């Protein structure tokens, strides 16, 4: 029930990655990357489809060899989500996947080669209307920038990015987005702030090599959260040493927490204490799993006692306040006469949530007639 926060987005040009708009007034897109071997076509397709199911807007696929490029051709034909080909070292791979319908090319300025090779990629992208992502990474800066700055700095990352933006400008190519990633939160944040002031193109956010699921989620939430709250960012990826599906879930959770883009159930739940009259932790865990299929934005509060329960329920679409044996139930902020049997709480609340979703879908369908 809480409204989206009117964060003033940085103004940028709009490009399209496949059918997904990026930049301008488009919603911030959530991206992930496969971690299968691309030549394992069956496994890669299965992972991409799993990412589609949890809402990934764009999926990046590493294409390190020509064999992987041939596999990419097959993969592209069997999935619906736009695919970005991640290209390093060999520019000819970019030319090959362009023939196979890639939706975006990601190149790394630090290792893709000289200007002539970049021009070959740009000319191909122009001919086929394929956008490019310039992906600068603190771990792979050009040698001369490493020598100039001594270590990765915001200025070094910015200089690397602008060096290649200038090349694309000279080639009269403006269908690109830029990232300046680092594993250090402060380095990444300051680099992105500088970049946001320097270019008008869309910006892809990420804290690279952030770590495992727990630490990486925290790093990403802090770094991306800071930037998003300042209006910076048009696409994002949460980089985790974990299942890529988790990257998408955390990405949407970050956007949801900032009330920038809502998708699915937003559970508001207390951390529990000795006052709780219901098993909040078990209830939330069960409902998160059961309701993963729901895409409709909805706030659901599950509070273990009457201290904060009623207040949270007042600003929720559905709310439960724990009480002895039978718990209070709120709908659209209004206390209902109906109460929930604590022993059947999970089933009863799931049914109410699904009924609320169906009601919303029906109302939207009527309005569209």
UniProtKB/Swiss-Prot annotation:
Keyword Thylakoid assigned: no
Catalytic activity: (2E)-4-hydroxy-3-methylbut-2-enyl diphosphate + oxidized [flavodoxin] + H2O + 2 H(+) = 2-C-methyl-D-erythritol 2,4-cyclic diphosphate + reduced [flavodoxin]
Coiled-coil region(s): none
Gene3D superfamilies: Dihydropteroate synthase-like, Sulfite Reductase Hemoprotein, domain 1
Chain sites annotated for binding [4Fe-4S] cluster: 270, 273, 305, 312
Cited InterPro entries: Dihydropteroate_synth-like_sf, IspG_bac, IspG_bac-typ, NO2/SO3_Rdtase_4Fe4S_sf
Keyword Iron attached: yes
Molecular function per GO: 4 iron, 4 sulfur cluster binding; 4-hydroxy-3-methylbut-2-en-1-yl diphosphate synthase activity (ferredoxin); 4-hydroxy-3-methylbut-2-enyl-diphosphate synthase activity (flavodoxin); iron ion binding
Cross-referenced HAMAP family: IspG (MF_00159)
Role according to the record: Converts 2C-methyl-D-erythritol 2,4-cyclodiphosphate (ME-2,4cPP) into 1-hydroxy-2-methyl-2-(E)-butenyl 4-diphosphate.
NCBIfam families: ispG_gcpE, PRK00366.1
Protein name, per record: 4-hydroxy-3-methylbut-2-en-1-yl diphosphate synthase (flavodoxin)
Source organism: Haemophilus ducreyi (strain 35000HP / ATCC 700724)
Designated gene of the protein: ispG
